């Protein structure tokens, strides 16, 4: 039905058009004007007319203007009728202004000009436990496994990787209530147990995949195959980097650490601009990046860079700002600046003796010392404004665990998990303590996760197979509610049964803490809008402050 009551808010009124960054199918960013706010009161259908007025569909339709002449209204009647609408407009405008002002401006080069809301965190550190940590031996104790050790599984067993399935297997590790929260933590992690009050342990994580490479891709990108951007690339793309001399996304390795199954594609920018890919730094080598130390004076290199830029800039314009060309230019300009920054970053001689001891750098355990150096450099990268940092476990070939998947104990679980925990326990706890003591934990979100968990029944005599149906991850810092448990698996630790959580939910929560609405950070490629959480994901608000 036609309604004569409509208040239009146009581009020239209090609500003006704001440029919004969108993507063409070829990946080139363009600015398009859209109304910043849609505020109106109407008793009839509303249409948006480009960047102009938002109007009632009939009141400005000349073909039906004769209908307006059939009814007349006094000014008093009109104001009385529309008073509620005017109030709604004013209130909505006030609320919108407050929400808009709560966002934070982002550095040049970020796809978003501002965060979507006030961020709780500025940086993310991803401690990836490649191979699959057993949740029932680490953060999700199951007394029933101990009581029924050696008995057949009382429920149907899903197909596993090798189908060499045994009976129920009790944990060889003891659990102790820890911290003020009293959360039980395995004897594998005595140091992490001391900081458990900083952790939000999610016991109901799930994955649809039980093979390493696919599960690794899914955990990193939200898709089971290569070719998609990793979480770190999305963070760097959307938020940019606070330090133009360093990449926005850094992957640290040390000792025998290599990329997990899936290779360096796990750190890929996918179809995002190339400068958002993960840059690998060797944390314990003289040169964190090969040939980072220049052979020529800096002034000479500057002249060369300026000379090359004379050709690059016109070519970039000829290609209509092709994303790959632009990324290549940005990459070698960043590499030039990194020549002086990276050696200083990796020089930890200025760190105190107490700091070295805290991270285990002076330990006789060379693997702990190597992983500890990654954790220390992660803190130093946070101090220098790097947006996303991923840490890599060192090789441990025990019970089928190998270079890409050292936590993969299909046999010798007690020995293999014990050795891997020895490597990472003290350094990760030290990272949390150090960040907190420096006032950095509040704006640094730490994510600890593997690609899946492990079965409550044995594989062979003393190992466990892959279990994607329910496992544990944890978050710390960055506005997370510490000292809590979220969700649960059944009493066997086989399936998530309470507050079932997905990888999409985890990354939606991380982006939320970084000030980003995961549904609104998109990139158009191949005819559709992609995002880290695909078409899924819910923010886990219960684990947030």
Regions found by a protein language model. Give the residues of each.
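Intrinsically disordered, low-complexity regions enriched for glutamine and histidine
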Residues: 16, 22, 30-36, 45, ...
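N-terminal secretory signal peptides
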Residues: 34, 38-74
């Amino acid at each position: 039905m036609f309604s004569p009551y409509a208040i239009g808010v146009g581009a020239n009124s209090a609500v003006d058009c704001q440029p919004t960054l969108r993507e063409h199918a070829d990946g080139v960013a363009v600015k398009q004007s859209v109304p910043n706010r849609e505020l109106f009161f109407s008793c009839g259908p509303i249409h948006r007319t480009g960047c102009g007025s938002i109007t009632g569909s009939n009141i400005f339709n000349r073909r039906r203007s004769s209908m307006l002449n059939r009814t007349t209204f006094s000014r008093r009647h009109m104001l009385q009728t529309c008073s509620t609408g005017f109030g709604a407009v004013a209130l909505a405008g006030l609320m919108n202004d407050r929400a808009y002002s709560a966002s934070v401006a982002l550095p040049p080069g970020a796809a978003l000009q501002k965060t979507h809301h006030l961020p709780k965190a500025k940086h993310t550190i991803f401690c990836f436990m490649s191979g699959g940590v057993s949740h029932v031996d680490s953060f999700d104790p199951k007394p029933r496994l101990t009581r029924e050790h050696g008995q057949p599984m009382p429920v149907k067993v899903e197909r596993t990787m090798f189908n060499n399935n045994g009976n129920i297997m009790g944990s060889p590790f003891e659990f102790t209530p820890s911290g003020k929260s009293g959360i039980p933590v395995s004897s594998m992690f005595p140091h992490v147990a001391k900081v458990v009050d900083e952790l939000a342990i999610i016991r109901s994580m799930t994955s649809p995949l039980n093979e390493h490479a696919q599960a690794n891709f899914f955990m990193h990108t939200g898709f089971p195959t290569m070719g998609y951007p990793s979480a770190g690339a999305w963070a760097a793309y959307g938020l940019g980097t606070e330090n133009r001399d360093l990449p926005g996304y850094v992957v640290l390795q040390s000792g025998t650490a290599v990329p997990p199954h899936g290779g360096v594609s796990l750190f890929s920018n996918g179809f995002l601009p190339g400068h958002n890919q993960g840059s690998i730094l060797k944390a314990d080598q003289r040169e964190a990046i090969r040939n980072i130390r220049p052979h020529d004076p800096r002034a000479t290199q500057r002249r060369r860079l300026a000379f090359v830029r004379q050709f690059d800039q016109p070519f970039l314009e000829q290609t209509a700002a092709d994303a790959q060309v632009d990324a290549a230019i940005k990459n070698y300009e960043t590499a030039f600046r990194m020549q002086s920054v990276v050696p200083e970053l990796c020089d930890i001689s200025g760190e105190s003796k107490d700091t070295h001891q805290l991270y285990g750098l002076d330990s006789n355990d060379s693997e702990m010392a190597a992983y500890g150096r990654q954790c220390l450099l992660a803190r130093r990268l946070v101090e220098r404004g790097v947006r996303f940092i991923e840490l890599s476990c060192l090789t441990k070939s025990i019970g089928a665990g190998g270079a890409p998947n050292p936590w993969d104990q299909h046999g010798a679980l007690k020995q293999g998990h014990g050795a891997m925990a020895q490597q990472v326990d003290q350094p990760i706890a030290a990272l949390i303590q150090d960040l907190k003591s420096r006032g950095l934990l509040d704006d640094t979100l730490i994510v600890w996760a593997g690609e899946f968990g492990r079965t409550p029944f044995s594989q062979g005599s003393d190992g466990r197979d892959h279990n994607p149906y329910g496992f544990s991850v944890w978050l710390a810092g960055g506005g997370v509610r510490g000292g809590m448990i979220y969700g649960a698996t059944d009493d066997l630790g086989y399936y998530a049964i309470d507050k079932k959580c997905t990888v999409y939910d985890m990354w939606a929560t991380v982006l939320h803490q970084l000030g980003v609405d995961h549904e609104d950070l998109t990139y158009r490629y191949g005819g559709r809008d992609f995002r880290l959480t695909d078409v899924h994901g819910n923010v886990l608000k219960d684990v947030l402050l």
